[in-house]
Amino acid sequence: MSTPAAGPVRQATGIDGTNIVYRVTGDPAARPLVLLHGWAQSSACWGDGLLADLSSRYRVVAVDLRGHGYSDAPEAGYDDSKVWAGDVAAVLDAENITAGAVLLGWSYGGLVICDYLATHGSAAIAGIVLVGAITSIGRGEAGGRVGKAMRAAIPGAMAEEPRIAIKALGSFGNALTGPVEGKGTEAQALFGLTLSTRPRVRAALFDRTVGHDELLRNLDIPAFVLHGTDDTVVDVSAGRHAADLIPGAGASYWDGVDHGPFVADPERFLGEVSEFVDGLDG
């Protein structure tokens, strides 16, 4: 099974036996770029066009996080940083990626990157990209500060009753794309991915507390923070917090852009991410 942009479907096994599905495309000899999506999304969120553009430059590995997309949705494990770290490590191991990889995380994917680095270190990683991302989670964690659309959606977004969930998630409006003309199709596709994620998984991802500030202060690889100033899902202050903590981090704050900069302006996104990735050593 495959799609033209996303590549063949492959599978790795996490430390608890969970099957993690991912797709690979691009030159096998190119630098690996591992894409980790956000809460209640899947690897489909990146869109065929952006995946095709990225895969013309890199070996793109687009992962479905546990509980999302085609990956297994176990009953437990969502509150354990080591389990999340193990999922990423399993994909890297399955692809024999031992050095030079770039991890790019959108939204909750940024937290998963930090989980991985906290457990496995940076030996296999050349750099990280945090896109509208959280790096910590829990009450009082500056790296996990959510925006007004996310606050409005909780707790209804976790409900099993469809009418409640749809109404709550509808409060996102255009948050994932921004009020960009002509993005209605993309907005509905992302909304569909959210609804297709099991309610118990939507809830479980918030049911943990972890702080990664110390990890970021001591990060020994380059990092690039990309965040919309009008992000209503993950407040821009969370991105600024990460950029301030990480030694030498680069940052790009997109004025007036909401939670999905790669949807709002894929060409600009491709350019900025490529500039960072192409400037890395190793």
Question: Can you describe what each PLM-predicted range is?
Answer:
Residues 15, 23, 62-104, 108, ...:
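Active-site loop/oxyanion-hole signature of alpha/beta-hydrolase fold enzymes
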Residues 114-159:
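Flexible "cap/lid" loop of the alpha/beta hydrolase fold
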